[in-house]
Structure formats: structure tokens, C-alpha cells
Amino acid sequence: DALIGVSMTGIASGVVLGLNMRKASDVVKRENTRVAKLIGINKAARCTTVKPAGTTSLVLGTSSGIHAWHNKYYIRRLRVGKNEAIYSYLKSNHPELLEDDYFRPHDTAVISIPQSAPKGSIIRTEKVMDMLERVKLIASEWVKPGHRAGSNSHNVSATVSVKSDEWKQAG
């Protein structure tokens, strides 16, 4: 069974929610059919998914997967080995973004990347039901239409934080 999972990220950045996701999932399935035929394999039974995309979201400047931005402004921190190419590059070109890791200063650094959520983005102060409705929308408009066959479909990977006063509503 061939398997691909074309994922979306940056959903809470505000642009994706205005797009026709069913049409996009059809494009994914058509392209999968074309490429599978071209390389001589079966087309995938499941084509679309949503998963968190930490590094990808940093590179693209988007929110991660389906998740809201942490806040309007914040600092995102990543640990990297001092033997990695990104460390050497930043040390030479942007040393202000680097600091030694507290626990492993001899071989690990922390990169601090300022973040700014774009205007119109969803931030984590949203209500839990808004998050759950977004998951439901993406599951029904992107993930399910990208499913061709079999009893198991891909899913929307999400961590849902429920505040103490939201448990009754969330169920």
C-alpha cells in the first residue's frame, strides 16, 4: 500500500482557512496518481494530513500545523549542536541569536528567534471550541477528501489545551 501524507502548516496564520481545501485535496490525489503511474507504483490510499511542523514553520514564518501562534510576539528557542552548520553560520553572521546552553555549554547552543504573528492570525488565547472546530473543519475539508481507500484515514495531529473553565463545553 503506497502512502503519502501531503500536510499543511500555518493554518492559524489566517490564509489557509480561506482556501478551497477540497479542491486542493483533489489536486493532491491527481498529482499522486500521475507520479505513481510515472514511477510505476500504486497510488496512495491516503494522501492528505496535518501534522505539527516546527522547523518548517520557522523557515516559512507560519504557525505550526493546525496550532495557534503562541502569542502576538514571543521568542522561540531551539537547541543545536555546536558542530552543526547552522551554529557556525549564525556564530559568524548573527551571534546575537546564540547563547550557550545552560546544561551543556561545551557542545550545545540555544538559538533565540524573535517571532511575530501576522495580522489576523489566531493566537493561543482562543477558546478550546474554536480550536476543536478548526480541527473538525480541516479534517472534513482536507484530510477526509484526500482519503481514497481503506478503513484508516490520516488525521489532524493536534495538541488541545483545555482551560479549567472549558471542560464542560469541550465534553
Regions found by a protein language model. Give the residues of each.
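Short capping micro-motif at the N-terminus of alpha-helices
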Residues: 45, 58-59
